[in-house]
A protein has these predicted regions:
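Short beta-strand-loop/turn "lid" adjacent to the catalytic site in phosphate-handling enzymes
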Residues: 61-122
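N-terminal beta1-alpha1 ligand-phosphate binding loop
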Residues: 8-24
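Glycine-rich phosphate-binding loop plus the immediately following alpha-helix
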Residues: 20-27, 36-53, 128, 134-162, ...
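Glycine-rich phosphate-binding loops at beta-strand->alpha-helix junctions
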Residues: 107, 299-307
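Conserved nucleotide-sugar donor-interacting segment of glycosyltransferase catalytic cores
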Residues: 115, 121-135
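Conserved non-catalytic scaffold segment of RNase H-like nuclease domains
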Residues: 34-75
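A contiguous, well-structured pocket-lining segment that forms one wall/lid of small-molecule binding clefts
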Residues: 219-301
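Short glycine-aspartate micro-motif
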Residues: 8-12, 97-101, 172-177
Length: 307
């Protein structure tokens, strides 16, 4: 990408599978960035549950073929849903939009076998909205010997320059991105080569285990403001066992929510389970921060953001 400023819509649906985040920005992809619009569009209850059910069915590569009919059906629905979002935004900004970044909905991710599957038909979306669509981000990263995740560090690299200038925060600058999976980025300096200037990795679960526990044990979808976790008590024995069983030994592989589950909290009350799972999640994020700052040669300020 040259130094030209592009106006783009980016659409992302994370592992919570509850809806689509849409952002309209203007950027050259290097050091200039302006936010124009951020919106959230929630999936209806039926689509949300069907997505969760489908993801639970897909346990291996063979299942992608086994459930191909259901995958194709929901993929079309997902694509049309994204198209409606773009058309709504385009009513205000149509003549300014250069391209669309379309992530889709991940239902299976296994970088070890070089497989990742996102629901979303980029070609159909382009036909629906009559605009250029960039898609298959994770597949292309894996084809080029990447892990397919995390992808946000490229954006963190750009934003770090803005933060450095506006807020006078010195490099290196860290980002803790807590989505379904948590990932940590460290941007080393302002003008480094992007391939050498970023240290980034998945650190463990973000909201995925907490959300799973809430969905299984209540009619809620998530722990709003952490109120449920605040009302319970940590079961230290179970927490220690979970840490021993799940602690990340290496940060060179991307993670999927299927790398973790809430089975270790079975038998606990709803509140105590939520509290213990939340502390387990926080512990792994803290260990990731410790690893990110392993040389301890410079103080790093970390910005916490949600996925």
């Amino acid at each position: 990408m040259n130094n030209k400023l592009y106006t783009a819509i980016g659409l992302m649906s994370g592992t919570s599978m509850d809806g689509v985040d849409a952002s309209l920005i203007r950027s050259n992809g290097i050091d200039k960035f302006t936010k124009i619009l951020n919106e959230y569009h929630e999936y209806d209850t039926s689509l949300h549950q069907r997505l969760i059910d489908l993801r639970n069915f897909i346990l291996n590569f063979e299942d992608l073929e086994k459930y191909s009919s259901k995958i194709n059906e929901i993929e079309r629905e997902i694509t049309i849903f994204h198209g409606k979002i773009i058309n709504q935004i385009s009513l205000k900004y149509d003549d300014k939009i250069d391209l669309i970044g379309f992530h889709g909905q991940t239902i299976y991710h296994n970088p070890g076998k070089k497989i990742t599957k996102q629901l979303g038909d980029g070609k159909l979306l382009s036909q629906l909205i009559k605009k250029k669509v960039i898609f298959d981000f994770r597949q292309e990263d894996i084809k080029n010997n990447g892990q397919g995740a995390p992808l946000t560090p490229i954006f963190h690299n750009l934003v770090s320059k803005y933060i450095n200038k506006k807020n006078q925060i010195l490099f290196p600058i860290g980002f803790i991105n807590i989505g379904g999976i948590s990932n940590i980025t460290k941007v080393l300096e302002a003008n480094g080569n992007i391939e050498e200037n970023i240290e980034a990795f998945d650190s463990g679960p973000g909201n995925c285990l907490i959300d799973e526990w809430i969905r299984i044990n209540s009619k809620k979808k998530f722990d709003n403001y952490g109120q449920i976790a605040q009302s319970g008590k940590i079961d230290q024995l179970i927490l220690n066992q979970a840490i021993d069983n799940f602690e990340i030994q290496s940060y060179d592989k991307s993670l999927d929510i299927k790398n973790f589950d809430t089975s270790f909290a079975r038998g606990l009350s709803f509140e105590d389970g939520c509290t213990t799972i939340t502390n387990f999640t926080a512990y792994l994020i803290a260990k990731g921060i410790e690893y990110s700052n392993k040389d301890k040669s410079k103080n790093i300020k970390y910005l916490i953001c949600g996925g």
